[in-house]
Amino acid sequence: MKGRRRRRREYCKFTLLLALYTLLLLLVPSVLDSHSEQDKGRNCPGLQRSLGVWSLEAAAAGEREQGAEVRSLAEGNPDRSPGSPGNLSAVGEAVTQEKQHIYVHATWRTGSSFLGELFNQHPDVFYLYEPMWHLWQALYPGDAESLQGALRDMLRSLFRCDFSVLRLYAQPGDPGERAPDSANLTTAMLFRWRTNKVICSPPLCPAAPRARADVGLVEDKACESTCPPVSLRALEAECRKYPVVVIKDVRLLDLGVLVPLLRDPGLNLKVVQLFRDPRAVHNSRLKSRQGLLRESIQVLRTRQRGDHFHRVLLAHGVDARPGGQARALPSAPRADFFLTSALEVICEAWLRDLLFTRGAPAWLRRRYLRLRYEDLVWQPQAQLRRLLRFSGLRTLAALDAFAFNMTRGSAYGADRPFHLSARDAREAVHAWRERLSQEQVRQVETACAPAMRLLAYPRSGDERDRKTVREGETPLETKANWAV
């Protein structure tokens, strides 16, 4: 009897121990998992923020938080504005007011040479005209999209007055030779150096007939004859003296590529984007088709980089493959094919930029100015003041007069399509109506309709278009706003 009771007690103890052991096995993994999740949270507190740092929604949320901080600072010291030295920058870091950098973001035949010249004429501006031309020429053939990162890195160096990057794309005189050392590079290798006000005036050119502060176009032949080339190091030293550095180019197709530069508080970058009626752009591109053919092919490769597109190029007489046998560039009908197709890619890039800026956070929009060529030539003085105010530059009566006179020339056309001269603004705006066929207009309007709508360019023949023609100088800029 006693033995039976003892066995029963031992059985109960064994059952209890087994139940406790089973419970322990179930609880331990659960406890470990709970601690593991807590550790993950402690180790990566900003995981979601890091993952979303490049989204506009996350940037906008950060902008709202930062705006509250800036407002509290402003309330504590009403004499200081959110952009004054010592306050928070747009990306939340303390910066001082230093050199201003401006990038003029445009495409071919939009009037960007005229816009850039307004900066070139200002005595407080160091201006570079399309320096990325060197990169495109050195890396041809290649599609525009694959070059965007290299263009951005080149811009970063140039804005810091470091021109050694140009050595990578300098063309040696002999194909068998190495590219010249940066110490031996001169201003003569820069694209369109003969019209640069800094290069063609004292102190870099003591014999120049005009001082740097004198407003007026530089005669390229006169500059070439009186201003011997100087080293790029001397140009770098001159660049560092100016409070504003402006670079104009047409080869950057995606505004979003510039976001890392815009977020860099040490760079203090702003962007001026120039648009133009795509029908006028197409008309101007057709007029200068041979000069834009290589560029158009590079843009067109952005859309189609596969074997099918290479076959299209070969069918039209162009060997697109590196190392392939050189072929003649296509004549007028085939050139028109490339120009029209490239314009479709450009309009797609415009639409992408417009949607990007429309949804951008406030800090980015403060660093962005949209300008239309038509508004600039109809109201040159008003738009110039708007441009200078955005760039932090003083107004000048001589520059006002220069802008007005450049838009009141005797004619639109010129024998040299890439030569800057005074133009008739009305001719410049409406020339496409007489020179493009109905089919060409239809093609452009079909390809560019979304961008045209956002920019308030009416389709030909509708009521708004007829009103624009009747009223002539009615400014259109106010109709193109951030809303769709």
From Swiss-Prot:
Membrane topology: Single-pass type II membrane protein
EC class: transferase
Region Disordered, annotated ranges: 71-90, 460-484
Residues recorded as bearing Phosphoserine in the entry: 460
UniProt note on tissues of expression: Widely expressed. Highly expressed in kidney. Expressed at lower level in heart, lung and liver.
GO terms (BP aspect): carbohydrate metabolic process; chondroitin sulfate proteoglycan biosynthetic process; N-acetylglucosamine metabolic process
GO annotations of cellular component type: Golgi apparatus; Golgi membrane
Subcellular localization(s) per the UniProt record: Golgi apparatus membrane
An annotated Gene Ontology molecular function: N-acetylglucosamine 6-O-sulfotransferase activity
Side of membrane Cytoplasmic, spans: 1-12
Catalytic activity from the UniProt record: chondroitin beta-D-glucuronate + n 3'-phosphoadenylyl sulfate = chondroitin 6'-sulfate + n adenosine 3',5'-bisphosphate + n H(+)
Sequence similarity: Belongs to the sulfotransferase 1 family. Gal/GlcNAc/GalNAc subfamily.
Function: Sulfotransferase that utilizes 3'-phospho-5'-adenylyl sulfate (PAPS) as sulfonate donor to catalyze the transfer of sulfate to position 6 of non-reducing N-acetylglucosamine (GlcNAc) residues. Preferentially acts on mannose-linked GlcNAc. Also able to catalyze the transfer of sulfate to position 6 of the N-acetylgalactosamine (GalNAc) residue of chondroitin. Also acts on core 2 mucin-type oligosaccharide and N-acetyllactosamine oligomer with a lower efficiency. Has weak or no activity toward keratan sulfate and oligosaccharides containing the Galbeta1-4GlcNAc.
Name the record gives this protein: Carbohydrate sulfotransferase 7
